């Protein structure tokens, strides 16, 4: 890295704290390209899957696109998920899924995606979709036998020396407040609370602020913070490695 400098504030509520060059951010949808897509290609490179494989090879209940008259049918491939040409909807109704399946429920999330409407015939259009990358997460975990967090850590983040990059598992406590259920990878090298390095994202209705718990609702509520569409936390220096 040729130049690294911090500007502005990393926090303005309940107190103001300045940004530092070591501040760690919720990478949100950048998680797709920073982790999920790369992990998929790592498995392809190792011969564990093929990008032209049908998704149903790894998720048997995953339905194909079928025309309204039932006369035309087309499978959805891993490549279609990666390139947002699968026809899957952009997002899913988090509150409805939570009511139906409970929280967290990665299996419920996949059941919904496997059977939800397909907006268009695969490979005929483009539509950015978080559901594509949540589906890729399930494929990665099925093929590797590891959680996305563990696979990315062992095969990507550690390999590149990204010491301050991680997924941060979370859940609601008994009072409904979001808390982390495991330490961040950088916790042992941080004096005091490892959350102190993280830039918070959003004030909650109870006055608390999300800090270390992914902001994306599907990733947080349904997938406990480890999700193919969002969930990576990282800093500028680590991102520069990628």
Protein language model regions, located:
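Generic hydrophobic/packing signal
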Residues: 38-44, 59, 82-89
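Active-site SXXK
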Residues: 26-52, 133-141, 239-242
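Short, glycine/proline-biased beta-turn/loop segments that scaffold the active-site neighborhood
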Residues: 51-67, 158-160
């Amino acid at each position: 890295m040729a130049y690294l400098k911090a500007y502005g504030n990393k926090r303005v509520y309940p107190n103001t704290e300045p940004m530092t060059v070591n501040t760690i951010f919720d990478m949100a949808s950048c998680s797709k390209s920073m982790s999920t897509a790369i992990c998929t290609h790592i498995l392809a490179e190792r011969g564990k899957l093929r990008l032209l494989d049908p998704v149903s090879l790894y998720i048997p209940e995953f339905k194909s696109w079928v025309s309204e008259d039932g006369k035309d049918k087309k499978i959805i491939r891993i490549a279609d998920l990666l390139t947002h040409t699968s026809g899957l909807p952009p997002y899913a109704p988090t509150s409805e899924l939570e009511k139906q399946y409970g929280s967290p429920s990665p299996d419920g999330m996949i059941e919904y995606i496997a059977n939800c409407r397909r907006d268009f015939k695969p490979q005929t259009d483009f539509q950015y979709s978080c559901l594509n990358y949540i589906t890729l997460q399930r494929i990665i975990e099925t093929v590797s036998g590891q959680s996305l967090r563990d696979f990315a850590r062992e095969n990507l983040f550690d390999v590149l020396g990204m010491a301050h990059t991680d997924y941060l598992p979370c859940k609601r406590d008994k009072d409904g407040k979001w808390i982390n259920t495991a330490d961040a990878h950088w916790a042992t090298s941080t004096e005091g609370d490892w959350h102190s390095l993280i830039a918070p994202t959003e004030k909650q209705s109870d006055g608390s602020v999300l800090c270390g718990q992914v902001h994306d609702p599907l990733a947080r509520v349904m997938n406990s913070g480890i999700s193919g569409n969002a969930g990576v936390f990282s800093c500028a220096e680590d991102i520069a490695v990628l």
